[in-house]
Every structure is written in structure tokens, then in C-alpha cells.
């Protein structure tokens, strides 16, 4: 369990994270995986080479190598390490004490969460876009790591923690600006947390939370919320329609680092199936759509994706000669 301390000192705010020295941030939250299989690498290379309009959908598993935990990974995910569960949308909207607790914890966790950097998997996908291989990238993550890596053909399905909005008037604010307002309102407040959650949340006691002051919207005085989809909320229908159109334009779909347990992402796999698109999945552990995939790889995203050359062509290989034909489930009408 890692410990995180946030306290004011000599006019500055200090954040300190302690973790076991034997575990670097890139491996702390990554579940065990088998060694890379050269044959699987070749199969993924062929899949990518034959793709002309590739759509990629990423989940929390792509960011664990950047030091951000996921929810469901065996032994290392939030659900495996603790009985804590993410905040529910209805609780946040209805309860001022719930918002106070959320923002106090988020305030402590923000310096660490916002400092995370893209790993080789994020950079690889950004490079695929630059070289014209990637038609569109859809991420279920809220960490902004794809944007930091330079991806532009990007939809952040569940929003982004780096933005804050007012629940009354919809005014948007940069999260870093809100951090300064938190500091101004809580000049002598300090806290020590145990454990970090996938969305930058940390774990504080009720006593620590009680004295924390939360700012309101500068424009209308309304309550503030991170611009993300909390559990129990729904994705904006216009955004869903937009992604459905991108899937229908694509000729193949690659899932990276997602178990697809959440319907907001899984629905696009169903659309791809309806379109009879070949589907490949790169994820450590089983997913909800393994039976729909023509290729499944249990490897670290940051180890495998950089090995794929998006410029390589297989003009001598016909789609019907692929070693991993579409599964019968994917061919069903």
C-alpha cells in the first residue's frame, strides 16, 4: 500500500508518495503476463498491416504501465486491493458532504495523478496516427495520457479529469486552476492518504475531510464536478453516436487494455460485430468479448505495441488467407 502526504510548508504545498522500492511505478499496478510470443507478434503485425481504417479502443490497462491503477485487474486492481468502490454520480450530485469528501481526496491526489506521463503504448498509437494508420482512437480513460502523447483523432468517451465543469451553468475550468483555488481556501489544511485510485482519488478519513473547504463556480456559484462520467451516469448520446459512426467507417477494431466489462465501451464491439469487422484484443486477462475476437493477446501494451510497424504492407497476403479468420460468432448476422 502506498502512502501519500499533502501538506503546506513555507508557503508551498508538498506531496510525497511512498511505495515499496522493489516496485517501480511502471509495474506496480500491472498484472502478471506471459512472455511475448513471437507468433502472436506476427499475427498482430499482419492484422495491423491489413487494416486500412483501423479504430482503436483503449481502457485502463494501457495506463497501468504509467503508474495508474485500474479497477478490475487480478491482484493489483482497485477491487482486488481494497473494498473501496468509485463514487456514484447520483451521490455526488445530491450530497454536499459527498462532494466535499470527493474534492478533499482529489485535491490530495491531483499532483501525483496529473504528473503521470504516457508510456510506450500511448506513444506508439500516436505514431500510428501520424503515419496515417489510425482512423480513430476511442479511450475509456480520463487521464489525458493520449493527449499528452499527441493523439488528435481522439474521443475521450468518459471525459477527462483535467477539466472541471459547473453543474448549474456548464462553465468549464482547467483542473490545475481549481487546484490553486483549493490551496487558497485551505492554507493550513494537511492530510496523509493511504492508497491511490484509478481516477486520481485517494483515501482519507472523515476527520481529515471535515475541515476541507470546497470552492464553487466563479460564474454562478454552483457546485463543481470533474468533466468525467461517474459510475451510474451515462455517456453523452451525441458522443456515443459520433463513435458509432467512426466504427462504421472503420475496417477493423483493436481493443487495448480493456476487459470491456462496462457497457459504454462494449456497445461498440457489438457494432463492430454487426459490421463484420475483424476484432483483435490486447489485454492481460479475459475480456467480455474474447469470443468475438479473431486475435487475443495477453501481453503488456507498452511492450507489444512498439514492436508493430504500421508502415509494413502485406500486399501479397489476402484477407481470406489470414491465419486467424473471423470467429463464427463474429460472422453471424
From Swiss-Prot:
Enzyme class, UniProt record, top EC level: transferase
Protein name according to UniProt: NAD-dependent protein lipoamidase sirtuin-4, mitochondrial
Function recorded in the entry: Acts as a NAD-dependent protein lipoamidase, biotinylase, deacetylase and ADP-ribosyl transferase. Catalyzes more efficiently removal of lipoyl- and biotinyl- than acetyl-lysine modifications. Inhibits the pyruvate dehydrogenase complex (PDH) activity via the enzymatic hydrolysis of the lipoamide cofactor from the E2 component, DLAT, in a phosphorylation-independent manner. Catalyzes the transfer of ADP-ribosyl groups onto target proteins, including mitochondrial GLUD1, inhibiting GLUD1 enzyme activity.
Localization (cell): Mitochondrion matrix
Cofactors, names only: Zn(2+)
GO molecular function terms attached to this record: lipoamidase activity; NAD+ binding; NAD+ poly-ADP-ribosyltransferase activity; NAD+-protein-cysteine ADP-ribosyltransferase activity; NAD-dependent protein biotinidase activity; NAD-dependent protein lipoamidase activity; NAD-dependent protein lysine deacetylase activity; nucleotidyltransferase activity
Gene assigned in the entry: Sirt4
Classification of source organism: Eukaryota, Metazoa, Chordata, Craniata, Vertebrata
Subunit architecture: Interacts with IDE and SLC25A5. Interacts with GLUD1. Interacts with DLAT and PDHX. Interacts with MCCC1 (via the biotin carboxylation domain). Interacts with PCCA and PC.
EC code(s) of this entry: 2.3.1.-, 2.4.2.-, 2.3.1.286
Amino acid at each position: 500500500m502506498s502512502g501519500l502526504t499533502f501538506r503546506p510548508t513555507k508557503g508551498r504545498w508538498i506531496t510525497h508518495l511512498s511505495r515499496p522500492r522493489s516496485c517501480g511505478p511502471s509495474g506496480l499496478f500491472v498484472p502478471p503476463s506471459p512472455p511475448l510470443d513471437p507468433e502472436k507478434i506476427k499475427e498482430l503485425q499482419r492484422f495491423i498491416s491489413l487494416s486500412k481504417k483501423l479504430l482503436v479502443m483503449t481502457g485502463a490497462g494501457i495506463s497501468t504501465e504509467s503508474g495508474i491503477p485500474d479497477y478490475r485487474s487480478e491482484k493489483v486492481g482497485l477491487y482486488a486491493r481494497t473494498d473501496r468502490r468509485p463514487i456514484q454520480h447520483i451521490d455526488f450530485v445530491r450530497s454536499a458532504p459527498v462532494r466535499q469528501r470527493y474534492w478533499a481526496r482529489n485535491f490530495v491526489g491531483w499532483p501525483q495523478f496529473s504528473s503521470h506521463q504516457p508510456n510506450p503504448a500511448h506513444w506508439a498509437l500516436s505514431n500510428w496516427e501520424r503515419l496515417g494508420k489510425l482512423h480513430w482512437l476511442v479511450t475509456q480513460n480520463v487521464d489525458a495520457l493520449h493527449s499528452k502523447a499527441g493523439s488528435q483523432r481522439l474521443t475521450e468517451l468518459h471525459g477527462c479529469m483535467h477539466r472541471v465543469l459547473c453543474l448549474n451553468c456548464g462553465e468549464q475550468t482547467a483542473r490545475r486552476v481549481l487546484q490553486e483555488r483549493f490551496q487558497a481556501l485551505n492554507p493550513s489544511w494537511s492530510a496523509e492518504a493511504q492508497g491511490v485510485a484509478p481516477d486520481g482519488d485517494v483515501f482519507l478519513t472523515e476527520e481529515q475531510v471535515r475541515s476541507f473547504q470546497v470552492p464553487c463556480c466563479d460564474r454562478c456559484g454552483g457546485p463543481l464536478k470533474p468533466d468525467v462520467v461517474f459510475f451510474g451516469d451515462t455517456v453523452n448520446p451525441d458522443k456515443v453516436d459520433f463513435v458509432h459512426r467512426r466504427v462504421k467507417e472503420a475496417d477493423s477494431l483493436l481493443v487495448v487494455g480493456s476487459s470491456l466489462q462496462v457497457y459504454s465501451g462494449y456497445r461498440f464491439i457489438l457494432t463492430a460485430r454487426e459490421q463484420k469487422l475483424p476484432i483483435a484484443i490486447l489485454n492481460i486477462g479475459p475480456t467480455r468479448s474474447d469470443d468475438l475476437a479473431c486475435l487475443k493477446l495477453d501481453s503488456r501494451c507498452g511492450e507489444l505495441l512498439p514492436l508493430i510497424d504500421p508502415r509494413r504492407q502485406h500486399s501479397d497476403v489476402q484477407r481470406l488467407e489470414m491465419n486467424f479468420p473471423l470467429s463464427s460468432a463474429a460472422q453471424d448476422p
